[in-house]
């Protein structure tokens, strides 16, 4: 992830806030959130199996980064300790589970519900940090977690009462939550590793393992890897270039100019942007329970993020 409270680490960044005018970074941040918001729409447009779309999304994101890594960081790979390499591999497996489950969830539930629930990973990061890293849970964090759980309950009850979008909203929502849990595992696995391993080599190792994991999932599912029409290949490339490279590259650039808390909370614009795009491009109107519950979940995430950074 970009920071401990975001979903992905994909490109180099600086942790400090650099001086200079903030207008361009803020505009860039808005553009990046818009690019990330297209991810769910592109997955919905694709007719390929979820694991295949996820595999090519990760593969096409990894290839240009691998070129940079070989060109500038070749010696860094040999310096990675075996224990750190294993940790990076585990992070990659967690990332594979995240993409596979989230992409699959979009086949069963609404874009708004899926993206909102998968974005809840900061809550699981906070819980995991408390359970495994012995980090303290402050009152804002606890309150944010409870608030977000309440939002999930609202969405789930709305699904049970009917009126929700999707052929099996309960399954789709559960898969999205699994995606959030896996993303949290990815963040927690990488938190300590990033203090010792340079970013680009770390990302290349993680994404290579993630691509391999998704390839295995696709093969076990019996999904074809080739033979797709040009439209599908364009969608695969769009997933890598838009949400993968453009979105997160610009976010990492913005992190060098803006406060990390602002960037972290701004990522909550993804569910809003995705829901708007789904309404316009897919004619998908989220159910009232999804809107209300999603708002509660997002409020809980904001409270948790502020408690973790305050």
Locate the predicted segments by residue:
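Transmembrane alpha-helices of multi-pass small-molecule transport proteins
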Residues: 48-97, 122-124, 181-186, 204-221, ...
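Hydrophobic alpha-helical transmembrane segments of multi-pass membrane transport proteins
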Residues: 34-38, 42, 68, 89-108, ...
């Amino acid at each position: 992830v970009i920071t401990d409270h975001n979903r992905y680490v994909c490109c180099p960044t600086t942790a400090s806030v650099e001086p200079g005018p903030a207008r361009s970074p803020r505009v860039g941040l808005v553009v990046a959130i818009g690019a990330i918001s297209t991810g769910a729409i592109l997955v919905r447009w694709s007719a390929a199996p979820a694991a295949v779309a996820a595999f090519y999304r990760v593969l096409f994101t990894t290839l240009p980064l691998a070129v940079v890594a070989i060109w500038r960081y070749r010696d860094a790979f040999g310096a990675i300790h075996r224990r750190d390499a294993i940790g990076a591999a585990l992070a990659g497996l967690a990332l594979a589970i995240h993409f596979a489950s989230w992409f699959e969830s979009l086949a069963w539930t609404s874009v708004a519900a899926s993206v909102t629930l998968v974005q809840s990973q900061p809550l699981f990061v906070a819980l995991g940090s408390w359970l495994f890293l012995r980090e303290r849970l402050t009152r804002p964090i606890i309150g944010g977690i409870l608030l977000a759980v309440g939002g999930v309950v609202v969405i789930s009850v709305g699904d049970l009462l009917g009126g929700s979008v999707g052929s099996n909203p309960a399954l789709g929502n559960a898969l999205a939550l699994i995606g959030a849990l896996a993303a949290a595992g990815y963040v927690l696995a990488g938190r300590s590793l990033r203090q010792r391993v340079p970013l680009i080599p770390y990302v290349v190792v993680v994404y290579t393992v993630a691509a391999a994991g998704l390839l295995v999932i696709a093969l076990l599912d019996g999904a074809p890897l080739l033979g797709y029409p040009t439209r599908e290949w364009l969608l695969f490339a769009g997933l890598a270039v838009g949400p993968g490279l453009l979105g997160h590259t610009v976010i990492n650039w913005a992190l060098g100019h803006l406060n990390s808390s602002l960037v972290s909370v701004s990522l909550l614009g993804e569910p809003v942007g995705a829901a708007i795009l789904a309404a316009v491009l897919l004619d998908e109107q989220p159910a009232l329970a999804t809107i209300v519950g999603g708002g509660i979940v997002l409020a809980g995430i904001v409270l948790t993020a502020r408690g973790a950074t305050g």
